[in-house]
Design a protein with these regions (language model features):
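C-terminal non-catalytic interaction modules
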Residues: 277-426, 898, 902-905, 909-979
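Amphipathic alpha-helical segments of tetratricopeptide repeats
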Residues: 31-38, 71-82, 116-126, 156-164, ...
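Residue register of alpha-helical TPR repeats
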Residues: 8-11, 48, 88-94, 133-137, ...
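Structural motif corresponding to the intra-repeat A-B loop/turn of tetratricopeptide repeats
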Residues: 20, 40, 60, 108, ...
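Single-residue signature of alpha-solenoid repeat helices
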Residues: 26, 66, 152, 191, ...
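Residue signature of alpha-solenoid helical repeat architecture, marking inter-repeat boundaries
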Residues: 4, 44, 130, 169, ...
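TPR-repeat structural position
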Residues: 23, 43, 63, 149, ...
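Residue at a conserved register position within TPR or TPR-like alpha-solenoid repeats
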Residues: 17, 57, 143, 182, ...
C-alpha cells in the first residue's frame, strides 16, 4: 500500500474506500487509513479517519467494532472541541443515534448502560441546541425492543410531535421505523400507507427503499396483495444482495420465500450468503436470520424433505432437518441473551412466533429461474386406523359414472376397480369393462387386452360392445404406425356392428364407437400420408366419408347421450383437420369453433382445449388477432384444473405474445409469468421457461419496471442458447438487460451486456443491430467513466453507421464523441478535437442533403443539421471555465452564438413543424447575446419567441415554458437597458 503523504491524499483514499463494497476488506482498509492519519500529526485528519472507520463498521457485519472509535472521538471532542470543524461536529452528534441502536443489538451491553447513554444523548443534544426528535426516536426504539408498549407509544407520539432538524433521521428511515411499528401492532395496511412515499421513490437514502421493500413483503402477503409482494421481492432483493450489512433485510426475503411456496429460491438465497450463519458482529440481525432459516427448514421438513442437503454453516454438510434443529437452538439462545438483558420475554416471544409461521400462499410464481419446487415425499404420520375403503360395487358404480360421462379420471377409477377386484369372482360384463379400460391405459401394450375385452363382452351377451372393443384395438395399432394393418383389422368390426345395428341387435352408441374408431384410423392415414402438404385426394376423400358417416349416425341422438355428443363434436374437428389439409383455413377455423362449442355444450369443456388451441394458431396465421386471443383464453378456461403443466405453459406463453403484440404489456406480463411458472413445473425451465422469462423481462421493461425486469432477464440468460432459442433471443435479452441496467444507474454492467450483444450481432448479415448496440454500449461506457473505451465504441458505431449509409447514426456518434472529448478531456482530442468532430458532423449532414431528393428524408436531415449546430453552440459555450480570462470567454461565446444562430435559421426553414426546436435555439441565442452584453439583440430574440406563440394553446406545457423563459429574458434585458 502506498503511504499517505498529506491530508488531501488521505481524504481521497477515504472517499475511494467509501465506494468499495461493504465488508471486512473495506473495514481493514479504514483501519489502515486511521494509522496513516495518525502519522500526519493533524488532529482533524485523525478525527475524519475515525469517523470514516466508524461509518464503515456501522455498515458492515462488524458493527460491534464501532464503539471503540466513537469513544475515542467523544473523548477528543470533550478535550479539544476546537479540533473539530463544522462537518465533524455534526457527524459526531449524528452518530450518537448509531450508538444507541447499536447497543440495543448487543445483548452483552446492560440495559442500564443503554438508558444511561440515552440520557447522555439527550443532554448533549440539548446543549448543542438540537430538537428532541432524534432522542425520542431512540427512546422509542429502546422501549419497543424490550416490550414496554406504553412507553413506546408515548415516545412514538413525542417523536412525531418534535420538530425536524438536522439531527433527525432522513424521511425514508423515519417512515420505515414508523411503518414497522404499525406492523408490530397488527396494522399492516397502515404501515404500507406510511411506506408509500419511500416505495414510490419520493424519499430515499443509502439503505432505502431497500429495507422498506423487505419489510413490506410479509404484510403484503397477509393482505392478499401477492403481485405487489412479488414485485417488491424482485426489486428489493436486487438492492439488498450487494449490501453485506443488511442481514436483517436479507432475512425478510428468505422469510418471504418460505411463506410463499418458494422454498427452492430460499435455499438459493442461503447459499449466496454462507457467512450470515456465523457472523457475530451484529447479534440482533443474526437472530433475525437464524429465525427465518428455522422457518424455511421446518417448512422443508414438513414437505417431506427433511433429509435434503441444504446450505448451512461451513465445516460440515447439513440436511434440512439438522439445520432446522441447529438454527432453532442458536436463535433461541440469542433471544434468551436479549431477554435476560432486557428482563422481559419480548425478544424470545417474537422469535418463536416468527419461526412458527404458516405459509401465506401455496405457491407464488416469481418469474425468475428456479429449480422448481422440491419434490415432496409426504411424511408418514400415525393414524387412528385404516380409512374404510369403498366396496367393490361402489367403485364399479363410480367408474361407470365417470366413463359414461367421459370425465377426465375415468381410467384411474377403473384401475382402482381392477385392484379391488383381484381374487373376486365377477360377472363377465364387469370383467369386460375392467379389461377394456386397462387396455386403454396401456397404449400399444394393450392391443391384446382389447381382444380379451371383446371376448368377455361377447360372453356377457353384448356383441356390439365386443365389436367396439376390437375397433379400439385397431385404432391403437394405427397409432403405432401400422395404418394398413389397422384398416384391415377394423373391416370386420365395421361390417359386423353395422349388421347388428340394422337388425336392432346393438345400440347407436356401440355402432358410433366402431365408426369413430374407423374414422380415426383413416385420419391417421391422412397424417402419415407421405405426400405431406399435398395429401392424396383418395386418402382425404375416404377419411371425410368415414367422418360424415359418424356424423350421420349420431345426428338426432346427441342431446341425450354425452358420448354421442362427443362423437359429433370430434367429427366436426376431424372435418376441420381435413379442410386444413385441403388448404381451406377459413373453413377449418369455422369447424374447429363448431367442435369446441359442441364439446362445451355437452358439458365436456376439457375436450375443447385442443381445438381452441388449433383455432388460435390458424386465426393468428389469418391475421385475426382478436379471435386468436379469444381462442387462447377459451382454451385456458376450458382446461381448468385438467390442463397439464406443459400445455398450460404453452397456452399462457402464446397468449402473452398476442397481448404484447396488441400493446397490453401489463396483462402480457401476467401470462408470461404464468408460462414461466408452469414451464418450471413441467421440467422445461431451461427451454420453454427460458423463453417465457425472456418475454416476461421484455414486458416488464415496457412498463418501466426496470429492477424486476433486470432480475428476470438475468435469470433467463443462463438457459438461453443460440441452439435452442436462436441467437436473436440471446441478443435481445442482453439488449433489454442493458437498457434496464442503464436505467438503474449500473452503467458498467449495462456496457458489458450491450457489448456482449454487439459481439453476437457482429456476425449477422444485417448490421443495423450491431451498430445500435455499439452506440448504446458507448453511452454506457461514458456514463461509467470509461471515457477512452467509450470513444472507441462510438468510433466503432460511427464506422458501422457509415457503412450502412445511416447519416443520422453517424452524426450522433460524432456529436457524442465531441462531448466526450470536451468533458473527459481525452488526451488525444480535447477542445480542438471536439470542434473537429462537431464540424465533421455538420459536414456529414450537409453532404447528405446535397444528394437527397426525397422530401421526407430532407426534412429529417435538416432537423439533424439544426440539432448539430445547436449542440455545437452549447459545446462551445461550455468549453470555457468561469474563471477564464474575459477575452477567452468572449471568443467562445461569439463562436457559440454563431452556431446557435445557424441552428435557428435551419429550424426556421422547417416551418411550423419545428417551432419548438426553433424557439429553444432562439432563446439559447438570446442568453448568449445577454452574456455578450447585447441587451437589445437579446430582447429582440425574446420578442421573436413570444410572437411565434401568439394565439398558441396555453395548455401546451412547452408553449408555457417557452413563453415564461422569453418573458424572463425580456424583463431582464429591459431592466438592463433602463439602468
Amino acid at each position: 500500500m502506498t503511504g499517505i503523504t498529506d491530508f488531501d491524499a488521505l481524504r481521497r483514499a477515504m472517499a475511494e474506500n467509501s465506494e468499495e463494497p461493504e465488508g471486512p476488506a473495506r473495514n481493514a482498509r479504514a483501519e489502515q487509513l486511521l494509522a496513516e492519519a495518525e502519522k500526519l500529526d493533524i488532529p482533524l485528519a485523525v478525527i475524519e479517519a475515525l469517523g470514516h472507520q466508524l461509518k464503515v463498521y456501522n455498515y458492515s457485519s462488524e458493527k460491534d467494532k464501532m464503539f471503540v472509535p466513537f469513544a475515542r472521538l467523544l473523548r477528543m471532542w470533550d478535550e479539544r472541541p476546537e479540533d473539530f470543524d463544522e462537518y465533524e461536529i455534526h457527524s459526531l452528534h449524528w452518530v450518537f443515534k448509531w450508538m444507541s441502536s447499536g447497543m440495543l443489538g448487543q445483548p452483552h451491553i446492560p440495559l442500564a448502560s443503554i438508558e444511561k447513554w440515552l440520557a447522555e444523548m439527550e443532554h448533549r443534544y440539548r446543549l448543542a441546541g438540537h430538537s428532541e426528535r432524534a432522542v425520542r426516536s431512540a427512546e422509542f426504539s429502546v422501549a419497543s425492543h424490550v416490550g414496554d408498549l406504553a412507553r413506546a407509544d408515548r415516545a412514538y407520539t413525542a417523536w412525531l410531535a418534535a420538530d425536524r432538524d438536522t439531527m433527525a433521521d432522513c424521511h425514508a428511515c423515519e417512515l420505515h421505523s414508523q411503518g414497522a411499528w404499525q406492523v408490530e401492532r397488527g396494522r399492516d395496511a397502515e404501515a404500507l400507507d406510511l411506506w408509500g412515499p419511500v416505495l414510490e421513490g419520493e424519499f430515499t437514502c443509502a439503505h432505502e427503499p431497500h429495507t422498506v421493500l423487505a419489510s413490506s413483503l410479509a404484510p403484503l402477503l397477509r393482505l392478499g396483495r401477492a403481485d405487489e409482494a412479488r414485485a417488491h421481492h424482485l426489486r428489493g432483493f436486487r438492492l439488498v444482495r450487494p449490501m453485506e450489512s443488511m442481514r436483517g433485510a436479507y432475512a425478510d426475503h428468505v422469510e418471504f420465500c418460505a411463506l410463499s411456496g418458494n422454498e427452492a429460491r430460499g435455499l438459493e438465497l442461503l447459499a449466496e450468503r454462507p457467512a450470515y450463519f456465523t457472523d457475530s458482529g451484529n447479534p440482533r440481525s443474526g437472530l433475525e436470520f437464524l429465525s427465518v432459516v428455522t422457518l424455511l427448514m421446518d417448512r422443508l421438513t414438513e414437505l417431506g424433505l427433511g433429509d435434503q442437503r441444504v446450505p448451512g454453516p461451513a465445516g460440515r454438510p447439513w440436511t434440512a432437518r439438522e439445520l432446522a434443529a441447529h438454527a432453532r437452538v442458536e436463535a433461541l439462545a440469542l433471544a434468551a441473551r436479549f431477554d435476560e438483558r432486557n428482563g422481559t420475554t419480548r425478544v424470545g416471544d417474537r422469535a418463536r412466533a416468527r419461526m412458527d409461521q404458516r405459509p401465506l400462499v401455496e405457491r407464488l410464481p416469481l418469474g425468475v429461474r428456479s429449480a422448481g419446487r422440491p419434490t415432496t415425499a409426504p411424511v408418514t404420520e400415525p393414524t387412528p386406523g385404516p380409512a374404510p375403503e369403498k366396496d367393490l360395487s361402489a367403485l364399479l358404480a363410480e367408474a361407470r359414472r365417470l366413463s359414461d360421462t367421459l370425465q377426465p379420471h375415468a381410467v384411474e377409477a377403473w384401475l382402482a376397480v381392477a385392484r379391488a377386484a383381484e381374487g373376486v369372482e365377477l360377472a363377465a360384463l364387469d370383467r369386460a369393462e375392467i379389461a377394456d379400460h386397462q387396455a386403454m391405459d396401456r397404449g400399444p401394450e394393450g392391443i391384446a387386452l382389447f381382444e380379451r375385452a371383446a371376448e368377455l363382452y361377447a360372453e356377457a351377451g353384448d356383441p356390439g360392445e365386443a365389436w367396439a372393443a376390437r375397433a379400439r384395438g385397431a385404432y391403437v395399432r394405427a397409432l403405432t404406425g401400422e395404418v394398413d394393418e389397422a384398416l384391415a383389422a377394423i373391416a370386420e368390426p365395421y361390417d359386423g356392428v353395422l349388421a347388428l345395428y340394422a337388425e336392432g341387435a346393438t345400440g347407436v352408441r356401440q355402432a358410433a364407437g366402431v365408426l369413430m374408431s374407423r374414422a380415426r384410423v383413416l385420419m391417421r392415414g391422412v397424417h402419415e400420408d407421405p405426400s405431406g402438404d399435398s395429401p392424396d385426394g383418395e386418402v382425404l376423400a375416404a377419411a371425410e366419408a368415414a367422418v360424415r358417416e359418424v356424423l350421420a349416425l349420431v345426428d338426432g341422438h346427441t342431446g341425450d347421450d354425452v358420448r354421442l355428443a362427443a362423437r359429433g363434436a370430434e367429427g366436426q374437428a376431424m372435418l376441420a383437420e381435413l379442410a386444413l389439409r385441403g388448404g381451406d383455413a377459413e373453413t377449418a377455423v369455422r369447424l374447429f369453433a363448431k367442435a369446441s362449442t359442441a364439446f362445451v355444450g355437452a358439458g365436456l369443456p376439457w375436450f375443447a382445449v385442443e381445438y381452441e388451441a388449433r383455432l388460435a394458431g390458424l386465426a393468428h396465421q389469418l391475421g385475426d388477432i382478436a379471435e386468436t386471443e379469444r381462442a387462447l383464453r377459451a382454451a385456458l378456461e376450458h382446461g381448468g384444473p385438467y390442463l397439464e403443466a406443459p400445455g398450460r405453459a404453452q397456452l399462457h406463453l402464446q397468449l402473452a405474445e398476442v397481448l404484447g403484440g396488441r400493446g397490453r404489456a401489463q396483462e402480457a406480463a401476467e401470462h408470461a409469468l404464468e408460462a414461466a411458472h408452469w414451464s418450471d413445473e413441467a421440467g422445461e425451465g431451461p427451454t420453454l421457461g427460458a423463453w417465457a422469462r425472456h418475454q416476461l423481462g421484455g414486458f416488464l421493461l415496457r412498463q418501466g419496471r426496470w429492477a424486476e425486469a433486470a432480475e428476470v432477464l438475468e435469470s433467463a440468460l443462463p438457459d438461453l442458447s443460440a441452439e435452442t432459442h436462436g441467437d436473436g433471443a440471446v441478443v435481445q435479452t442482453k439488449w433489454w438487460l442493458g437498457d434496464c441496467l442503464s436505467e438503474l444507474g449500473e452503467h458498467r454492467a449495462a456496457a458489458e451486456r450491450r457489448l456482449q450483444a454487439a459481439e453476437i450481432a457482429r456476425h449477422w448479415p444485417e448490421q443495423h443491430d450491431h451498430a445500435t448496440l455499439a452506440h448504446l454500449a458507448a453511452e454506457s461506457l461514458g456514463h461509467a467513466g470509461l471515457h477512452t473505451e467509450a470513444d472507441q465504441a462510438y468510433t466503432r458505431a460511427g464506422d458501422l453507421w457509415r457503412s450502412l449509409g445511416n447519416v443520422h447514426g453517424l452524426v450522433r456518434s460524432l456529436r457524442a464523441r465531441a462531448w466526450l472529448a470536451l468533458r473527459a478531456d481525452l488526451a488525444d482530442l480535447g477542445l480542438d478535437g471536439a470542434r473537429e468532430l462537431m464540424s465533421a458532423a455538420i459536414e456529414e449532414c450537409e453532404a447528405a442533403l446535397l444528394v437527397t431528393d426525397d422530401e421526407e428524408t430532407r426534412q429529417r436531415l435538416t432537423g439533424e443539421l439544426g440539432h448539430t449546430h445547436r449542440q455545437f453552440g452549447e459545446l462551445l459555450a461550455r468549453s470555457v471555465a468561469e474563471e477564464a480570462e474575459d477575452t477567452a470567454i468572449q471568443g467562445a461565446f461569439e463562436d457559440a452564438l454563431t452556431q446557435t444562430a445557424e441552428a435557428v435559421a435551419v429550424f426556421a426553414a422547417l416551418g411550423e413543424g419545428a417551432v419548438h426546436t426553433r424557439t429553444a435555439a432562439e432563446l439559447a441565442a438570446g442568453w448568449l447575446e445577454a452574456d455578450l452584453s447585447r441587451p437589445a439583440d437579446a430582447a429582440a430574440r425574446a420578442r421573436g419567441v413570444l410572437k411565434a406563440y401568439e394565439g398558441a394553446d396555453d395548455g401546451d406545457e412547452t408553449v408555457r415554458a417557452r413563453r415564461a423563459e422569453a418573458e424572463q429574458l425580456l424583463q431582464l434585458m429591459e431592466e438592463q437597458t433602463d439602468k
